[in-house]
């Protein structure tokens, strides 16, 4: 699906969510182009904490403080004295031109009470079964399907592969296990124990090294043990990659191998994927009721940030995306005049968790261009992996705040969204894990939220030891530290 000339990202909840460095990421020759630390010409002095001026034109209105407070409770009733969450910690969705809420501003909010009563929700239980999260590492490639290695290389960059210039390998599945262990605190997270493998399907063993559709096999196989699932293949409509694999077929394979003790499982795929014939591509999708998700890595390749017409402003990824000057410039494209900073906006921009996040992100210095590319790739993927698993917890797209569970209309919007959960979505996960899985009551849920923040901070701090630190993780760590002061 195409929206406003931007590729769509699919998800398991309507509206769709749009969303790797390839195995042969060029770095030797192109390393000077991949230094991602932005030159901070913009100081991000004033923060955009309310929705943008464009939001009104789009028809989006953030639910008021009472509605947001009520949405956090499983009873659906707001506390007698409503204390609004500080906007400097939990800002509103930006709602910029071509964002998801631009196209679906009336998207129905899902309160904690509505989430609790979702028919498709799989309730967690303290019984020792169906209580684990699984991460399936990227499938290997058999000799018969060796031609598929070429498909993970962005079109136009194979000459670097032929010169033997190999960049960072894909992020290890272990990194995602560590992250999800913190993000879904107190849930056991495991690597799927047996590997999956891409292989040829039937007698179709074409070399398929070109981008021409005639050179592509119609199907390939995804094997696990003695079982093999047929996966459809097509050329990428935008030619970003030589080939795409069908998401629905991959999800069917994932469902068939779901362990008995799994609450949910996510499969990582290095190849570009699509869902329907109308899609340009699809980055992530979850079948929440079936408890499985698939996330591709290819479209998060930072090389694609420079594609004509789809350039990503690396100096305004989250948390810098809340820069008022940046927001004003994007609104001006739609003839929406930016408003001057008010006294209140100036005051709010001097402190708070979002200010701490922007300062921490700006202070980050990568150790090398290789490390920076690898870490950026992982940070982008981590957001989508946690988002898609959120749908397996029956969380719908969030419209209450800027939140990791927001829907996404483009890759540009994807990198502008936060890695944290808003109070409403966090309350749902707290009820599922601290309440249902561990039998806790309201006090235990509040304690769990604090412990989760600590776990995420610990994760962020340890990334430096693994050469996986980035501006997003530093920003999240700064945000968490400031948030916890008020807890």
Locate predicted features.
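Metalloprotease/metallohydrolase-associated module, dominated by Zn2+-dependent proteases
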Residues: 320-380, 396-487
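Hydrophobic alpha-helical signal peptides and transmembrane signal-/tail-anchor segments
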Residues: 22-33
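Low-complexity, intrinsically disordered or signal/transmembrane-proximal segments
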Residues: 10-13, 18-19
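Short coil/turn segments at secondary-structure boundaries
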Residues: 146-151, 278-281, 306-311, 397, ...
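Active-site-proximal segment of zinc-dependent metalloprotease catalytic domains
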Residues: 235, 239, 247-386, 392
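N-terminal low-structure segments adjacent to metalloprotease catalytic domains
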Residues: 34-282, 436-487
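Eukaryotic short linear interaction motifs
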Residues: 142-145, 273-276, 302-304, 412-414, ...
């Amino acid at each position: 699906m195409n929206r406003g000339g931007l590729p769509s990202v699919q998800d398991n909840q309507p509206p769709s969510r749009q969303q790797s460095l390839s195995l042969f990421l060029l770095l030797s020759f192109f390393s000077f182009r991949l230094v991602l630390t932005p030159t901070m010409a913009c100081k991000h002095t004033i923060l955009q904490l309310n929705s943008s001026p464009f939001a009104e034109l789009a028809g989006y209105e953030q639910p008021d403080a009472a509605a947001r407070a009520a949405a956090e409770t499983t009873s659906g009733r707001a506390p007698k004295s409503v204390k609004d969450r500080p906007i400097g910690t939990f800002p509103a969705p930006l709602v910029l031109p071509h964002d998801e809420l631009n196209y679906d501003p009336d998207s129905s909010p899902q309160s904690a009470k509505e989430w609790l009563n979702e028919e498709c929700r799989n309730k967690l239980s303290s019984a020792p079964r169906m209580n684990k999260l699984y991460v399936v590492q990227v499938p290997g490639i058999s000799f018969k399907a060796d031609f598929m290695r070429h498909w993970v290389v962005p079109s136009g960059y194979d000459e670097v592969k032929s010169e033997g210039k190999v960049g960072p390998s894909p992020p290890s599945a272990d990194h995602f296990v560590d992250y999800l262990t913190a993000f879904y605190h107190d849930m056991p997270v495991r690597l799927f124990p047996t590997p999956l493998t891409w292989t040829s399907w039937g007698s179709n063993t074409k070399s398929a090294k070109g981008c021409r559709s005639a050179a592509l096999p119609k199907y390939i196989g995804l094997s696990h043990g003695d079982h093999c699932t047929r996966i459809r293949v097509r050329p990428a409509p935008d030619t970003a990659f030589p080939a795409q694999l069908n998401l629905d077929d991959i999800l069917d394979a994932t469902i068939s191998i779901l362990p008995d003790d799994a609450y949910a499982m996510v499969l990582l795929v290095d190849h570009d994927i699509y869902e329907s014939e109308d899609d340009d591509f699809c980055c992530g999708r979850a079948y929440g009721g079936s408890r499985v998700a698939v996330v591709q890595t290819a479209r998060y390749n930072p090389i694609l940030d420079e594609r004509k017409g789809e350039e990503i402003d690396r100096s305004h990824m989250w948390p810098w995306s809340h820069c008022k000057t940046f927001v004003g410039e994007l609104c001006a494209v739609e003839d929406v005049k930016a408003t001057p900073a008010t006294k209140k906006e100036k005051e709010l921009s001097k402190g708070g968790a979002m200010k701490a996040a922007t300062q921490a992100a700006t202070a980050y210095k990568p150790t090398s261009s290789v490390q920076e590319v690898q870490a950026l790739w992982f940070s982008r993927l981590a957001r989508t992996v946690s988002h898609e698993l959120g749908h397996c917890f029956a969380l719908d797209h969030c419209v209450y705040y800027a939140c990791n569970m927001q829907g996404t209309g483009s890759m540009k919007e994807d990198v502008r969204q936060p890695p944290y959960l808003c109070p409403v979505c966090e309350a749902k996960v707290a009820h599922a894990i601290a309440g249902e899985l561990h039998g806790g009551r309201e006090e235990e849920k509040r304690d769990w939220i604090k412990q989760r923040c600590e776990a995420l901070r610990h994760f962020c701090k340890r990334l430096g030891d693994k050469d996986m630190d980035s501006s997003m993780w530093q920003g999240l760590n700064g945000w968490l530290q400031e948030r916890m002061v008020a807890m």
